[in-house]
């Protein structure tokens, strides 16, 4: 497929996402809102977009106000829709839930509508990340050439739909991206970097090359069977824990956008019990279970690369 055809499909798919989101938000407003609870988080400024989040203050919104914020959030796809001071790199998050009363016919209609939106979002992400054939660093410029100001993460994010929950509880999750590597794999990566000299602020080209050479020497000095691990922290995320009484099971969802809960009165479902979301404080995290960590030694800080001792 030609690059021109891909761009045509990209734009066409995105227009469909916008149209279907507009139709969904209009549709939801026609149905009976049983309960709504969303939690706005402080906006991340451009100056603080790379800073670690040690505390997050939560503001709760209820009822129609919560619904208005949620429906607007689903359609928040461009930086032009937000403050100039707000970071375009930091994710815009609005955890919470909207609960609507439905019968069998309405439930099926909304399920199909949301499934279609999620299919379009997945297709759009596939075009950008796979079909474009571009490395991650080049995708941003390519997408924004055709869709200026697009917040790609918001365009990718699918909607979460649940049916007849008994309870909904919100919380915070701290995660790491973990990848195991061999010594030779790391050396291969560093070789590629050494073969393409460049400057990386605040270092000059020569300083950066020297830094890479030192890193290469440090890794080469390790035994070939050394166990290396990238353990990169991900910014804390809001989550929702859903309890289904009939199935006697709990399901956990990432919750960057409000969940849509359908309460089917044809099946005798009742209004769920919905909890709040506490402020986040990194110094007061309580772990239900924290396994004994493997002893690790940091060897290349910029890569979050550790070696197992």
Curated annotation (Swiss-Prot):
It comes from the Bacteria. Gene3D superfamilies: 3.30.54.10, Replication terminator Tus, domain 1 superfamily/Replication terminator Tus. Keywords: Cytoplasm, DNA replication, DNA-binding. InterPro entries: DNA_replication_term_site-bd, Tus_dom1, Tus_sf. It is found in: Cytoplasm. Pfam families: Ter (PF05472). GO terms for cellular component: cytoplasm. GO terms for biological process: DNA replication termination. GO terms for molecular function: DNA binding. Trans-acting protein required for termination of DNA replication. Binds to DNA replication terminator sequences (terA to terF) to prevent the passage of replication forks. The termination efficiency will be affected by the affinity of this protein for the terminator sequence. Belongs to the Tus family. NCBIfam families: rep_term_tus. This is DNA replication terminus site-binding protein. It comes from Salmonella paratyphi C (strain RKS4594). The lineage of its organism: Bacteria, Pseudomonadati, Pseudomonadota, Gammaproteobacteria, Enterobacterales.
């Amino acid at each position: 497929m030609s690059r021109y055809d891909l761009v045509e499909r990209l734009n066409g798919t995105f227009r469909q996402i916008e149209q279907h989101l507009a139709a969904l938000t209009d549709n939801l407003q026609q149905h009976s809102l049983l309960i709504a609870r969303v939690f706005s988080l402080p906006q991340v400024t451009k100056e603080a977009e790379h800073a670690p989040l040690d505390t997050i203050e939560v503001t709760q919104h209820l009822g129609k106000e919560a619904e208005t914020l949620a429906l607007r959030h689903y359609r928040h796809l461009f930086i032009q829709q937000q403050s100039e001071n707000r970071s375009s790199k930091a994710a815009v998050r609005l955890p919470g839930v909207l609960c609507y009363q439905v019968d069998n016919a309405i439930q099926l209609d909304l399920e199909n509508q949301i499934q279609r939106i999620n299919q379009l979002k997945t297709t759009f992400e596939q075009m950008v990340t796979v079909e474009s054939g571009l490395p991650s660093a080049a995708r941003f410029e390519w997408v924004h050439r055709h869709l200026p100001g697009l917040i790609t993460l918001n365009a990718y994010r699918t909607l979460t739909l649940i049916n007849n929950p008994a309870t909904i509880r919100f919380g915070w999750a701290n995660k790491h991206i973990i990848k195991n590597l061999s010594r030779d794999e790391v050396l291969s990566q560093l070789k590629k970097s050494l073969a393409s000299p460049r400057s990386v602020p605040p270092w000059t080209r020569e300083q950066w090359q020297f830094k890479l050479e030192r890193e290469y020497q440090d890794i080469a000095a390790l035994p070939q069977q050394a166990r290396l691990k990238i353990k990169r922290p991900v910014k804390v995320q809001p989550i929702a824990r859903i309890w289904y009484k009939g199935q006697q099971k709990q399901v956990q969802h990432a919750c960057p956008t409000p969940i849509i809960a359908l309460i089917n009165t044809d099946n005798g479902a009742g209004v769920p019990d919905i909890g709040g979301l506490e402020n986040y404080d990194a110094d007061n995290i309580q772990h239900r279970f924290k396994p004994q960590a493997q002893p690790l030694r940091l060897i290349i800080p910029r890569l979050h690369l550790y070696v197992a001792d």
